[in-house]
Every structure is written in C-alpha cells, then in structure tokens.
Amino acid sequence: MTDLTSLTLAEARDGLANKSFTAVELTDAHLAAIEAARVLNAYVLETPDQARQMAKAADAQIAKGEGGPLAGLPLGIKDLFATKGERTTACSKILGDFKPTYESTVTTQLWRDGAVLLGKLNNDEFAMGSSNETSCFGPVINPWRRAGSDAKLVPGGSSGGSAAAVAAGLCLGATATDTGGSIRQPAAFTGTVGIKPTYGRCSRWGIVAFASSLDQAGPIARTVRDSAILLRSMAGHDPKDTTSVDRPVPNYEAAVGGSVKGMKIGIPKEYRLDGMPAEIEKLWSQGAEWLKAAGAELVEVSLPHTKYALPAYYIVAPAEASSNLARYDGVRYGARVNGRNIIEMYENTRAAGFGAEVKRRIMIGTYVLSAGYYDAYYLRAQKVRTLIKRDFEQCFDQGVSAILTPATPSAAFGIGEKGGADPVEMYLNDIFTVTVNMAGLPGIAVPAGSDSQGLPLGLQLIGRPFDEDTLFSLGEVIEQAAGRFTPAKWWA
C-alpha cells in the first residue's frame, strides 16, 4: 500500500472517495508520522483522540455520500488559531495553558467541511520572527538538510511548524498566517506552496492578533492544487471581523491548470538587489522563461517605493503589536506573576511572559507611537504605505496580471546563524514579501528550484486584489516546470 503520508491532499481526497482507504487509516498514518518526527518539533500539541473521532465521523459521512469538500483530510493548525477546548498559546509563555471557549472562524469552516484536527503547530512567538526560533517551545527544525551536512536549519517563520509539517508529511496541509511574509518565506524554505490571500479574504476572528492591518490567514500545502482546495474552505465573509470582505468565494481549484496565454507578467527592476545571490537571480530568470513558454508576456515594471517598504513595515507592525499585546496583563487569563500591587503584577507578568523578540517589538511600537515621535515615524510610515499601494495600482492599471519576484533572498539558514547581535539581519529576510502585506495584495510562493547545496528555493507571484485565481494558474505553470520537492527522510 502507498505511504498515505506521501499523498497530496487532492490524491487523498480522491482515495477516500474511491474507498481505497478510510479516513481513520489516513489519520492513523499521519499520527504515526508525527510521533516518529518529534525531533522536528513541528507540533506543540498533538490531539490523537480528537483526530480519530473526527476521522470516524468523516468515514460515516463519506459512507452516506454526505462528506464535505475536506471530509477525512487530516490538517495541522498553527498555534495562533483558537481551537475550542484545546490549548492555544501563540507559542508564548504569557498565554500559559490558555484553552479558548470559542473556535476561530477559519478552523470552524475547515471542520464544517469535514477536515480532521491532528494538533497545533509551532510558530514564532506571537508570529514575530522569520525563523521559528522565538517560540517558547523551542525552534522547529527544517526537514531539509544541506547536501552532505547534518547541520540543523530553520524552516522559516513565523509559520515554521506549518511549513515543516507539510514538507515532512506530518499533515496533508496546514493553516498559517502572514503579516510580513510568514506564509511565503517558510514555504520557500521547505519546498512547499504557501498563499497569503488578499487582506479581508479570510476572517481574522479567533486568530491571535499581531498587526491587525497586515495579518491574513492562508494555507501551506504540498502543491498549488492543494493550496487552492484549502483556501476555498478557509475564505469567506465573516460579520465578526469588520475587515472581512463580503464577496463570493470562487472555486479556486478550477483555476489550477487554467491558460496563462496572453497574461502580462511584471518583472520589477527594484527587486534586483545589490549583492543578490546569483542562484536567486538565475531562478528568477528561469521562472520568467517558464511563464513565457506557457504563453505569458514579460514586461519590466517599476515599483519605486520598494526600498522604503521594510523600514515602514518595521514601524507599522510593531506599533500595532504594542497596542494588541497590551491585553496580556495576567488579570483574566494566561500566566500571572504576582507583585506587591497591580502595576508590579503587570510588569512582572509581562517581563516573565514575553520573549526577547516580542519585548523588542513592543518597545519599538510604543516608541514610534509616543507623543514626540508619532508624526516623524508612524504617520510617515503610513504615508509610505500609501505610496507602495499606489505603485502596485499603477502597475496593474497598465494591464499587468501578476508580478513575479523571488520569494526570499536566500535558502534556509542554520539555527542560531542570524539575528543574534543584529536583529536587522533577521528582518532582511522579509525584503521581498512585506510590500504585499503593506498593499493588502495576494501573494503565492511556489518552489521553483534548488541552491548549490540542494536546498529548495521559491518564487513569488503577486496578484491584483481578490485575483487569487490568476496566481493559482500561474503558480501551477511554475510547479509543472520545476517539479515537486520532497526532503530525504533522516528523522525516523
């Protein structure tokens, strides 16, 4: 029998429909894989009993011909999504053993469609990080290794657990969130596909907030088709989220394999950075050639304010975070460290509960929002954000269907290798991805090649607002040309 954990989500769906195996068998195979791969530290909470119950219920639905679009398909959930009665911590000590009394909208929709919960996935604390090294549960280890080396590599972040679990066959797909690249960068580092939908496409209700005007949920999966299937279930209007957009959710899967003939693909000259590795440059050109061969037209475009995106992002995001994280004070939920009075209790709780990177961003955010600096920093960053958005609008107004860029400036790096003395070194990982969040656009990362050491590299496609369909069509062209990327199993 085929190894059930090596199937794509679409293949598993077809296998269940054909009665080749049951949802319980599929779930058990994934639970065994999770157990054998604990060294990767991808899961921070395993829910085997609940998984088997949900799988059993899915089998009953499938037998009656009433299974939903995701019936019996086992998924991992990033620990930023509230799961009713199951520990949700955002991988921070300050939330302790918090068990929500409610379910996030995105996960509610996944369970409505019959999906199975395998457990909660590791992430950077409060989604603040690009390497999954800031989690209070410890770092996630990338299932990929450099050729001839057993050095531990990061899976990217903040959705490192989601990307590692999908790459290692520990779930058929995973939920993730993206504030400045947290879906696309880990997908690129692990040879998986990750899409950040348009801002407002997926509800943020029940997701632990980092930066509310930038956060967006999306899937990480093994293929473009799988990510399209998952996004259809995750997306939709939610009156509980005031930023949720009320427009119909298309059948994204129908766009996979769609013709790209005649589409104009923008190649932004500002993304050609000084010191960009030759491998990334070559991959980018190769991706453009693949799209051209499929009938797309390549045009050079200009996004002149790109160079200001990263500094503006690292003002806006920490400012919103400092406001959002003010709610963690030890009073009503989460961990508490007592003091002689309430102020001291707040201080002690936050000092003990937040990790170093979260404290750094809260302090940056509080600083840029303070009376003397608000105009100079925060207001100016918001004006820059408007200019970045306008750059993209002008580009799309010229008939460009999508923009092709690298997803990351490098392949996965070693654990402990970056950001020790200089956090900016780590922040530079987001250089190709933050513009998309600042403009609220959809962006997909698709694995497109390998570096000289055999590590996967990804390309990014940026689309018009609510035109995820085009990204799925173009992404599939790259996927077909580049092939699949699967790490050699060293952990079991």
Swiss-Prot record:
BP-aspect Gene Ontology terms: translation
Assembly and interaction partners: Heterotrimer of A, B and C subunits.
Enzyme Commission (EC) number: 6.3.5.7
Keywords for this protein: ATP-binding, Ligase, Nucleotide-binding, Protein biosynthesis
GO-annotated molecular function: ATP binding; glutaminyl-tRNA synthase (glutamine-hydrolyzing) activity
PROSITE patterns associated with the record: AMIDASES
GO-annotated cellular components: glutamyl-tRNA(Gln) amidotransferase complex
Recorded catalytic activity of this chain's protein: L-glutamyl-tRNA(Gln) + L-glutamine + ATP + H2O = L-glutaminyl-tRNA(Gln) + L-glutamate + ADP + phosphate + H(+)
Natural source organism: Rhodopseudomonas palustris (strain TIE-1)
Family note: Belongs to the amidase family. GatA subfamily.
Role this protein plays: Allows the formation of correctly charged Gln-tRNA(Gln) through the transamidation of misacylated Glu-tRNA(Gln) in organisms which lack glutaminyl-tRNA synthetase. The reaction takes place in the presence of glutamine and ATP through an activated gamma-phospho-Glu-tRNA(Gln).
HAMAP family, sorted: GatA
UniProt cross-references to Pfam families, sorted A to Z: Amidase (PF01425)
Residue stretches spanning the membrane: none
Protein name: Glutamyl-tRNA(Gln) amidotransferase subunit A
Domain of life of the organism encoding this protein: Bacteria
Active site residues per record: K78, S158, S182
Catalytic EC class: ligase
